[in-house]
Amino acid sequence: KRIAIIIPYFGQWPPWMELYLYSCSRNPTIDILFFTDCPSPGDTEHVKFHSTTFDEYCKRAASLLNVRFAPHRPYKLCDLRPFYGYLHRQELAGYDFWGFGDIDLVYGDLSGFVNDCALDRYDILSTHADRISGHFCLLRNNEANRNIGFRIKGWESLLENEANVGMDERPLSQVIVPE
């Protein structure tokens, strides 16, 4: 199964970036697709860097989602996570799963958790049993999951709100497992 994790990241790489990239290299079944203005440390077989600015990325999201999305801080991009499948559908062509994650994780051997048995059985994998976790989540690359963000109640106003509202966690969890 082909898996891609989308990570927009702007500013400066954190001091632990080399360690993060090393941990990615130890999980060859997962591709990491960065959208960034940071200097590329160089593509590896499973980590790709797409050069863009924060403003360009926000304008692309605003245009595709038809909302006013012009945050002042990159952390607000976490609220776009439920829409990554839709926003990056071209880059995700050919992948079986897409997902999102944080770069302050050091991945161990994910094959115990992300394996053919789990990928065949589930449409969504996350690190918590009762909710979606923003630090690591995979969704089957199908039309329903590419459009899952549009099912979040009031998604337009949540995206247009300057503050980060955690759309990748509670609001997305409420769509998947209604309370």
Predicted regions located by residue number:
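N-proximal low-complexity "stem/linker" segments adjacent to membrane-targeting elements
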Residues: 1-19
